[in-house]
Structures are given as C-alpha cells and as structure tokens.
Design a protein with these regions (language model features):
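Glycine-rich beta-alpha loop segments
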Residues: 1-54
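Short Gly/Thr/Asp-enriched flexible loops that form oxyanion-binding sites at enzyme active sites
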Residues: 42-47, 107-117
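Glycine/threonine-rich flexible loop motifs
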Residues: 10-12, 105-108
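Glycine-rich, charge-decorated loop segments at or immediately adjacent to ligand/cofactor-binding or catalytic sites
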Residues: 38-46, 132-144
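Short, acidic/small-residue loops that bind anionic groups at enzyme active sites
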Residues: 59, 98, 114-138, 151-153
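Acidic/glycine-enriched connector segments
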Residues: 35-99, 103
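A charged, well-structured terminal subsegment
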Residues: 94, 146-172
Length: 172
C-alpha cells in the first residue's frame, strides 16, 4: 500500500483512507507498507493495529532513522529505497495506491512497469480520492494515444473513486 505520510493533507483524504483501512481490516488483510505513523500512511497503520491485523513494515537501511519505526508483526530491512519498492511489489498480493508524493508515485510506476514486463500479474488499484490522480491518468492515456506506450492499459491497473469499491477485489 502506498500513500502520503504528510500530516498536512485535507480531511477528505484522511477520512477516505480510514474507511478503506477499516474495510480491508474487515477482510483480515495484511498491511505491507513503507512504515510511517504519519499522515494517510499512519492512518492505515493505526487502523490495522487497532483491528489486530497483521502488519509488515519494510524499511530501507539508508533511510533508517528518518522514518518512524512502527510496532509491526514483521520488520523487513532492505538496503535502499529501490530495494524497498521491489520488495513491496514482489511480496504483496496486490498494490493499492492512494494519493501521495514522489515515493508513492515511484511505487505506482514500479508496480506498473513490473507488471508490463511480466514480473507479476497482481492487481494494481489506484484509489482516486477527490480526483487526485486525474492528471496522471490523463498522462497515461496520452502515452497510449500518442503511441509512446502500446500496452493495453486496462490490463495494467484499475481505478476506484470510493473506498467501498475495493470490496469487489476482496471477493475474488
């Protein structure tokens, strides 16, 4: 799961994030994430913790100390951020991307590129809270329309606009 760790995001993002986390906990999902108690990432972590769901924290050694270390059931230490991205993509059952900054975008792009290259065939879900990803989705479409990317994007990722839409992926 990738999302913002900023404490300054608007409430709409935090509310939708908490509702999504509560729904995932209902299905007893495991949280595998980049380890932060702040922002949307912290909201997800705290919701999973409160619901006694399994939490796996993946931290790069190069950033150790810059990120808050959370109380996780498992802690995985990797050498650097690029290793963290690969670990998250390769070891999760699916990737859920919520609004975030550069780290979140790196996770999204890594997930999509690895899927295109056949390294995995896992679901990638973009949670487009408040239209946050509208411009990047237009960019993806432009890549396809102008032949920079010939891959059928409908096979790469799904977009949801409300937390409740995640349920259709849980029932599979």
């Amino acid at each position: 799961m990738g999302c913002s760790s900023s404490n300054d995001v608007e409430d709409i993002y935090l509310k939708q994030t908490e509702q999504l986390a509560q729904l995932l906990c209902k299905y007893n999902c495991t949280l595998m994430f980049g380890s932060s108690e702040d922002g949307m990432m912290g909201m997800i972590y705290k919701t999973f913790k409160r619901n006694n769901c399994k939490i796996i924290s993946v931290l790069p050694k190069e950033n150790y100390g810059m990120l808050s270390e959370v109380d996780a059931d498992e802690k995985v230490y990797v050498n650097k951020t690029s290793d963290q991205l690969k670990y998250l993509v390769n070891n999760g059952d699916m990737t859920i991307i919520l609004p975030g900054s550069f780290g979140t975008m790196a996770e999204l792009m890594t997930s999509i590129q690895c899927k295109k290259l056949g390294e995995h065939n896992k679901k990638i879900i973009i949670f487009n809270i408040n239209g946050f990803f509208d411009n990047i989705l237009k960019y993806f479409k432009k890549l396809e329309q102008e032949k920079f990317d010939l891959y059928d994007q409908t096979q790469l990722y799904d977009v949801i606009n409300d937390y409740s839409e995640i349920e259709k992926y849980m029932e599979v």
